[in-house]
Regions:
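Conserved beta-strand hairpin/beta-sheet module of binuclear metal-dependent hydrolase folds
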Residues: 2-50, 88, 147-149, 155, ...
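General small-molecule cofactor/ligand-binding pocket signal
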Residues: 8, 92, 117-121, 134-136, ...
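Active-site-proximal loop/helix segment associated with metal-binding centers of metalloenzymes
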Residues: 17-18, 129-205, 209-218, 224-226
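Active-site neighborhood of phospho(di)ester-bond hydrolases with catalytic His/Asp-centered motifs
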Residues: 37-40, 57-65, 69, 93-94, ...
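Active-site metal-binding motif and surrounding structural segment of the metallo-beta-lactamase
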Residues: 42-92, 117-122
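Metal-dependent catalytic neighborhoods of phosphoester/phosphodiester hydrolases
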Residues: 72-79, 101-104, 272-281
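Active-site neighborhood of divalent metal-dependent phosphoester bond hydrolases
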Residues: 85-120, 270
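Binuclear metal-ion centers of metallo-dependent hydrolases, dominated by the metallo-beta-lactamase
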Residues: 123, 212-300
Length: 300
């Protein structure tokens, strides 16, 4: 069975943090991978509250260089060094993000005992046997990426079918998986006739962007879409001017892209007391929409 993807919503707020919502940050865990998507101010504290050790981080995906998505990095870098972090920390982001990271170390005169590698990426930039991560350029002030994390569905043998054909356990089953066929007791068996194909799982993150034609194809068929919703429909013109999405646009994107679940994030402080209105607006267009709170966890 494909291993579960777990999303911890460390920060669901917008540019100004509030009592309830921290700057944007999301932790995606899958197997031995701990992927931090954005690192706003206060992310370290949120990790502690979520009982996630910073040393669990294997990769950081930065959507763009704006402070509400990056101000948590200087402290995180120093904490990892203090905790004896031994892994190579790989940071991915749009073109120009290397200059941002270099600037952090220049500003604080800091060094780390562990290796940091910064990669400026677009398109599918990482693929293993189990998963792939891709980036797509969005429309914001500075260059900005959306990200998708795709877990490849497994092919597993169907025990009921094996029993039906009286096929016992043994090395021949390993051969079946490797070659796609096997000879067993004088008969030839094909893998697809004895197996169950699990579906892929896809999680997408769209933060800080104006509506554009690249969003829907990129997030298409996502099991979970974590999408910014900084403005209500009543402020649609302002959202457009500042290059952000409204809750209505998020709902329409989810519906058109055949998404299974929509999570509204990047909630502006102006909606601190009535964020449910954003949820209501999005649900008119896409029913399976939720409004996560900080430290909520979602298993995919």
């Amino acid at each position: 069975m494909t291993e579960k993807v777990k999303i911890t919503f460390l920060g669901t707020g917008g540019m100004i943090p509030t009592e309830k919502r921290n700057h944007p940050a999301f932790f995606l865990s899958y197997g031995n991978e701990g992927i931090l998507v954005d690192c706003g101010e206060g992310t370290q504290i949120q990790l502690r509250k979520a009982k996630i050790s910073p040393t669990k981080i294997t990769k950081i995906l930065l959507t763009h260089r704006h402070g509400d998505h990056t101000f948590g990095l200087p402290g995180l870098f120093r904490t990892l060094a203090m905790l004896g972090y031994k892994k190579k920390l790989v940071i991915y982001g749009p073109r120009g993000i290397k200059k941002t990271i270099d600037g952090i170390f220049q500003a604080f005169g800091d060094t780390t005992e562990y290796e940091i590698e910064v990669k400026e990426i677009l398109g599918k930039f990482l693929e293993t046997k189990e998963f792939a991560i891709s980036a797509e350029q969005m429309v914001h002030g500075p260059l900005c990426n959306a990200y998708s994390f795709l877990v490849k569905g497994n092919t597993k043998l169907d025990k009921k079918k094996l029993k039906k054909f009286k096929i016992k356990d043994g090395k021949h089953l390993s051969e079946l998986k490797q070659k796609g066929y096997m000879n067993y007791e004088g008969k030839k068996y094909v893998l697809k006739n004895l197996a169950i194909e699990e579906d892929d799982k896809k999680v997408s993150f769209v933060l800080d962007t104006a509506f554009n034609d690249r969003i829907v194809p990129f997030v298409k068929d996502s099991d979970v879409l974590v999408c910014e919703s900084g403005f209500g429909e009543e402020l649609a013109e302002k959202a457009k001017a500042y290059m952000h999405l409204t809750s209505v646009e998020a709902g329409k994107i989810a519906k058109k892209a055949n998404v299974k679940k929509l999570c509204l994030v990047h909630i502006s402080e102006r909606y601190e007391k009535n964020s449910s209105e954003l949820l209501k607006q999005a649900k008119k267009h896409f029913r399976n929409t939720i409004l996560p709170n900080d430290l909520d966890v979602l298993n995919v």
